[in-house]
Amino acid sequence: MVTLRLAKPADIGALMDLDPVSVTDTRRAPFIGQATRSRACHVMESDGRLIGYGVLTHNFYQYGFVELLYVHPDFRRKHLATRLMRHFEGLCATEKLFTSTNKSNIPAQQLFTALGYERSGVIENLDEGDPELVYVKRLTR
């Protein structure tokens, strides 16, 4: 059974182990720590093991923004990213929820489109040669 909950400081080490980017990007560890301490990080757990996580903030021009969404490869294609995004939609305190992904990340683009997100813009130069595609969903309250 997969459960969703707020991340706790005790989860930070497991989150670092879960996310391969934390090995190559020195900014990831402080980001995960800050997101956890500010209660913006939510984790998915199965049999006591962290299998995915995401970060929802409200700092994108005062709108909700899913800054990060990650599911371990062994647990992909099981609708867990969908479940996490819907969880964030329910928690979002604004009428619009934004998120983004690299142009190279076709599965994330397909996920956002399937969930009713619309392309809202492009940010160049974050990752060289791989623009960031911004998505928005208007939430009904």
Set out the residue ranges of the language-model regions.
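Acetyl-CoA-dependent GNAT
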Residues: 2, 6-68, 72, 85, ...
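Active-site acidic-Proline motif in GNAT/NAT acetyltransferases
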Residues: 58, 72-78, 103-104
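Short acidic/polar active-site loop segments enriched in Thr and Asp
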Residues: 62, 95, 118
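Conserved acetyl-CoA-binding loop-helix of GNAT-fold acetyltransferases
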Residues: 71, 77-90, 110, 114
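Accessory recognition modules or surfaces
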Residues: 78-85, 97, 131-140
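Conserved GNAT acetyl-CoA-binding A-motif
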Residues: 85, 91-103
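Conserved catalytic-core motifs of GNAT/GCN5-like acyltransferases
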Residues: 98-101, 118-134
